[in-house]
Amino acid sequence: MTPSQGAIHREQRRQAWAIHGGPVGLGVAALGVALARLPLPSRRLRERLFRTVFGKKYPPGLNEAEMDRPLAEYPTLNALFTRGVRPEFRPIPAGTPQFLSPCDGTVQDVGRVERGRILTLKRIEYTLESLLPGTDTAAFEGGHFAVVFLSPIDCHRVFAPQDGELHEATHVPGSRLLVHPPFQRAEFPVYTLNERVAFRFTTPLGPCALVMVAGWGVGNITLPAAPDFRPRQRELATKTWAPPLPVRRGEWVATFELGSTVVLVVPPRDEVTPLVSPNDKVRYGQPLFTYPG
């Protein structure tokens, strides 16, 4: 049963209080998106702030060697979150029958699609129809899924998991509940309650769906291939590419402004081998599933 809006709002307040610590923390959290876009005037201030904040809260901190520019050249927190990565640190395997990780992060769940549903380790069940509105979900029956959580120190760009074509991106309005695993509860199925953008691809291995789920503090989800696609938070909207947009594995397709979670759903095939397990750290371009062939 879907919780009421009142229950969702109460849960949002409870989560925010728990993670940010009282009314002051709630106020800072509410201003988080604006603060993340606030320019930091001094290069020295940026370096000290970024290293201190991320090093203490998310050890071992930021991997500066792989960033696409020096740390002091990111003028805002949002610019740091949405940074690129030097390509030599993300080699993309060419021509392999595999679906690759679409992002950096930590694997939360890996499993099978059964009876049109996915079941997470926290025993929260999601139907593909609710996760991917308007998609022919029957094509994924018996397939696999992976859920990757992006922490604040991860690169917040999202990439194509296989060669193929991008057909559409659908913005689904919703809430902004926390997606961090300790805060997930069965009464509030965040992947279908929260605002999200669902992408539909075709690939040589079959259809593929990728869902970017917004969480607490996410400012926006942007698409390099459609910079004008900025639907309102409460608006269901679809961007369709006709003809479909060719994409290469490892090609940048979208960005979280701040961060959240990506759900990847891949098609059924005999002898598909999952290559990762829950709690594994992954980088974009790293193989998640190998297909026979």
State the predicted function of each range.
Residues 1-293:
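Contiguous, well-folded functional domains in the mature portion of proteins
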